Amino acid sequence: MLEGFLVLKIILIGTLTITSYRAVPEQTKPECTGRHRCETSIGENVSELGVAVSPDLLASGRVHYRDCLYISGVGFRIVDDTTNSRLRNTVDVFVYEKAEEKAFGVRHLKVWVVQPDQK
């Protein structure tokens, strides 16, 4: 082990469906009004650094709340929310504006979990 260095373990989850969502009542909770009063599944305020993952990814044990994901072409994001239960193998990237959401569309990208190596 190298002293003073953090060793990371990078695990490929696979190629997943990547979409986007906004903090509006029809996509989250009735009390959500834009950026305010919208909490994620872990009780944090929504943020452009957060993503929602489909329940099947959480149930599989491959992904956990607060995990750091690297999404090809998107960057690093933190798992802080859950998508609708009907979705499978999906990550929703948070965006603020409707135009951003429309421009993002639906993508199929490689996703990795980045964790400190506990060895």
Question: Each predicted region: which residue ranges?
Answer:
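Solvent-exposed, well-ordered loop and adjacent helix/strand elements within mature globular domains
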Residues: 2-5, 9-119
